[in-house]
Regions:
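Functionally critical mobile loop/hinge segments
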Residues: 3-103
Length: 103
């Protein structure tokens, strides 16, 4: 969504990369805790983050690759996000399910 917003606002390829870097920096780590009202809130947060990531990138502001999980380019960053999702979140998912089962 964020890159689509950037495209509609005339973002260059370099700015599209910045959008990806900004989104990864802002949202990576958000966890799914089951289908519930929290999902709607997470959708709102992600939408807000998309608009902010685009606004920053269009001003050539970007969280660089030396910070957090960001890589030297968008592809590296997305690869890092994939590693966090699997295998990185396997135990987290099990823990969330255990918490939900105990309710």
């Amino acid at each position: 969504m964020a890159c689509g917003l950037g495209y509609l606002q005339g973002a260059t390829l370099a700015q599209q990369t910045m959008i990806i870097q900004n989104m990864a920096s802002g949202l990576t780590g958000m966890i799914c805790d089951g289908g519930n009202h929290g999902c709607a809130m997470k959708g709102i947060v992600a939408t807000d983050a998309a608009f902010r990531a685009v606004d920053l990138a269009l001003k050539n502001v970007c969280i660089s690759g030396i910070h957090g999980i960001n890589g030297k380019n968008a592809e590296d960053t997305m690869r890092h996000m994939g590693l966090i999702a699997s295998p990185g979140m396997v135990q987290t998912e099990k823990t969330i399910v255990e918490i939900m089962e105990q309710k």
